[in-house]
């Protein structure tokens, strides 16, 4: 069903909560997806972050389902949740028909007032799985296909007495380029099913909520943030490339003249860097940069796959977050590599 029409007929809101992890590869970044997932699933700090969030949800009276792609991860997370819920049910696609039947019978017989957590593989809760009590989804391992997002989120969208808000917790491993890219792709999936998007009834205040915008809707909110800027702006993008200079160039020039610190980081050079140099703005090149974002006053973060200084596809998305800790983490990532070099700055061209 169309997300907006479905939401109009439901009493609960849909909330996306991104959780940025500290996980990073110790060895080479050139690992396959399978290798990365295997390593991530065994990371103690990351698993503890997930379990702490699940625990809080249970304390709030919520009914969580934790999704992962590995059977071993299901077992480990379920074991960690046991102290916090009266019932912890595991659902694994590889289980026998008998095991699946027993698990579903257990679910059907759990009183709605008893605390419950489900830990499952994504394949298990595809089409056909129905448990209306669920109101909180924890995406414990990265995926990118938006069809999976719609399918998984759909498990939360069944009407149930007392359901006022459904949440999805997404664990984003921003220090792993492949995982960072996959999360940016997931934003499109979340937007398509009504998570973190602007309300059509006009009631949403985009300066207070964390929202997902597309290439046609982000500019009003982004420029309002720039008007309120007090100290600094860091932009990270793939390249500075356009046919006509965007409004942002003149806006950056005005901010610079008002004493705002500005730095633009790029992955590819050889396009329109000189326009920013002429405006007096530092441009810093780093050939392994993967993150696309804008960080305002080290607290407001615009993060996604929209290039603020270049071309964008119609279905590009960006998410606005107000979180100083995440903003600081991204600044550390952007500045951490010694291979960066300043191409242009306010006093001279091509350093």
At which residue positions do the language-model features occur?
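Post-DEXD/H (motif II) to motif III coupling segment of the RecA-like Helicase ATP-binding lobe
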Residues: 1-14, 190
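Short, basic/glycine-rich phosphate-binding loops at helix/coil junctions
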Residues: 14-36, 81-85
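C-terminal helicase lobe
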Residues: 28, 35, 160-204
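Conserved interdomain hinge at the start of the Helicase C-terminal
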Residues: 28-69, 76-80
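Conserved helicase ATPase core of P-loop NTP-dependent helicases/translocases
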Residues: 75-76, 86-125
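A short beta-strand element within the Helicase C-terminal
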Residues: 118-119, 127-142, 151, 167-170, ...
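Conserved SF2 helicase motif VI
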Residues: 144-168
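PLD/PLD-like phosphodiesterase catalytic module centered on the HKD motif
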Residues: 203-351
